Design a protein with these regions (language model features):
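Domain-scale recognition of functional cores that engage charged ligands
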Residues: 1-225
Length: 226
């Protein structure tokens, strides 16, 4: 309630970092909202569903089979890169040793990812190896190893803090989805558009708010048309 008015919708602009829950009041505030009838974007369950660990689990065929129609699975799996758990998993025995071996042999081919969003939290190359070799068991549980994506480069103008720069770039395309659920029943599940983030080719990290990339849009070109 705000005054005598019930809050219908809460949008979380923050709440994705441990730094957002430094004190008891912040944690109690989140608990209060979770137990209310307010629509949350996202609620705790949806936020957890977007974590890197869930992405890694969905790359396993036996897990993906539980959530997607079988005719779709080959096409979906063809878009995945390899992701590995850093701890022993009953679904994938020997996975952690395999992940460590892959990272140490070819660090330039992998990225270490925590359960975080917003950019600026990943580890690459030598820093990744240093991090892996000094992580506690609980820290290993909170990270996954992902094969690095090597997108095709293109030239673009980037505008950052009022300064423009024409440089070689790479872009990431993501889909916007809307999911509205109530007490376990899905009321709405729809694709509703896309997001393009473009950054300099020599930048490892992503994230618009973190200052690593810029918003962009797609431009459709017909082959053979001048």
């Amino acid at each position: 309630m705000i005054g005598n008015n019930p809050v219908a919708l809460v949008y979380y602009r923050a709440g994705y970092s441990p730094a957002d829950f430094k004190n008891t009041e912040a944690k109690k505030g989140r608990e209060l909202i979770e137990h209310s009838s307010t629509i949350q974007t996202p609620d705790l369950w949806m936020q957890l569903a977007g974590m890197k660990k869930i992405q890694q689990a969905l790359t396993l065929p036996e897990i993906l089979n539980q959530f997607a129609p079988k005719p779709w699975i080959p096409q979906m799996a063809s878009t995945f890169v390899k992701m590995h758990s850093l701890v022993e998993d009953t679904q994938a025995p020997g996975e952690s040793l395999k992940a460590m071996d892959l990272a140490n042999k070819n660090p330039e081919s992998w990225v270490l990812k925590p359960q975080r969003e917003g950019g600026g939290n990943n580890y690459f190359d030598k820093k990744m190896i240093q991090k892996l070799n000094n992580m506690t068991p609980s820290e290993l549980k909170a990270h996954v190893l992902m094969e690095r994506i090597r997108p095709r480069s293109h030239s673009a103008w980037l505008m950052v803090q009022g300064q423009s720069d024409y440089t070689s770039c790479v872009s990431e395309i993501g889909r916007y989805g809307v999911l509205l659920a109530n007490r376990g029943t899905i009321e709405l599940n729809s694709d509703c558009g896309y997001l393009v983030r473009t950054k300099s080719e020599d930048v490892n990290e992503g994230g618009v708010c973190a200052g690593y990339s810029c918003l962009n849009t797609l431009c459709l070109e017909e082959k053979g048309v001048p």
